[in-house]
């Protein structure tokens, strides 16, 4: 019984800490990659970051976590379409859109959808990155997207 209680306390403590983690808003990380789509190798840039959401007074009230896949070496990038994709949230992050069907890389799975060994990722031959850039957005309180408390530690309305 002591072991069960100790495990319960450990998980409760870790859950409480993870809910209070602060992620710096208005930051991004950029990396370069290659993938194969419809038999053609292409280079792309992946950018993840936190986008602030402001109220009418100009105060940041939330931060949205996003991942932006941008195809490199495009002649007229100003006219390139952008697909914005998001799950309903909260509780359902955009990870399955990234890693299951739309993103440039997908999980290694068999025909029935079960993971295969060695675990990992492979190029997504059906990604739309060849024709449009993709932005995945996690709604507030999903994944890393969060409301930002005010100076009194109260959440905005």
Regions found by a protein language model. Give the residues of each.
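Bacterial Sec-dependent N-terminal signal peptides
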Residues: 1-20
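Conformational gate/switch positions in structured elements
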Residues: 3, 40-41, 139
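Generic hydrophobic/packing signal
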Residues: 14, 38, 50, 141-143
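Catalytic-loop region of hydrolases
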Residues: 19-82, 100
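N-terminal cap/lid subdomain of alpha/beta-hydrolase-fold enzymes
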Residues: 58-156
